[in-house]
Amino acid sequence: LYLENKLDFVKAFSPYLDAIFCTTGGEYLQKLKQPHLSVAYLPNVGHRNVETLQQFSNTNTDKTFIFCGVVYKEPEREKFLKDLADALEQGHVNYQYYGCFEQPGVYGKAYYKVLSETKMGLNYSRRNDVTLYSSDRIVQLTGNGLLTFSPRIPGFEKLYTEQEVVYFDDQFDLAKKIQFFDQNPEQAEKIAKEGWEKTRKSFNAKRITQFMVEVTFKQPLSENYEWSHEVYA
C-alpha cells in the first residue's frame, strides 16, 4: 500500500467490497477506511503443508545464511546487502545470495531445496519502515524453522518477539549477530524453534481465515489476535 498506484487500485474496487485485508498496517491501511466496509491488517499466512521443514533440528545443512531477493536498483538496499556480504566474508561466514548481484533467483521447489540446506535466513523487504509490513519471507523462513533475522519493522514485535526472531539495527549489527549465532548453535536453535512454533500457532491459515470471517461479517473477535488493534470497521 505504500505504492500509490497499488493503493489506488484497491480503492477502485472498494465500493463493491464488504471488507479489505492487507499485509500493511498503520497510516497506509487507514487510507482505505470508508463507512460501508471494514478494513483490517492481515499477517502473512503460513500453512503446515507448505512450510514443512524443521531446520532448527537439521544437522545436515551446508549453508549458514541466505538471502533471497532482488535489489530493485535501489542504492540503499544495494549498499545494505553489499556491506553485509563484505562483513560476512571477513567473518568467514558461509553465506549465499539468490536473485541479486548476478546470482540466479530460486523459486518453487528449488527455493524449498535451498531452505532445506540452510540454518539462517534474512527477512528484508523493499520497505522496512512501514507499520507491520513484511514480505512473505517472514513465514517462509520462520515456518520452515530457519533462524530468521529481521529489521525492526514498526509494530512487528507484536507479531514476533525477540525470543522468536533476531532483530537488528543495521547491516553491521546484523553481521555481528549472524556470526554470534553461527558460533552459538544451541541459542540459534532455541530462537528458531520458538519462531517456528509462533508461525504454526498464530499465523496458520485456519486462524487467519477465522479472523477474516469474523471481521467480514462484523462478528465479535473470538480471540485476542496479536494484530486486532489494526481493525477499522
List PLM regions with ranges:
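C-terminal amphipathic helix plus adjacent low-complexity
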Residues: 177-233
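Secondary-structure boundary/capping signal
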Residues: 39, 92-95, 164, 186, ...
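Generic anion/oxyanion-binding catalytic loop in active/binding sites
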Residues: 103, 130, 163, 184, ...
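Conserved acidic donor-binding segment of nucleotide-sugar-dependent glycosyltransferases
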Residues: 165-171, 181-185
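Nucleotide-sugar donor-binding catalytic core of glycosyltransferases
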Residues: 2-159, 167, 219
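Short acidic, glycine/proline-rich loop/turn micro-motifs
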Residues: 160-161, 178
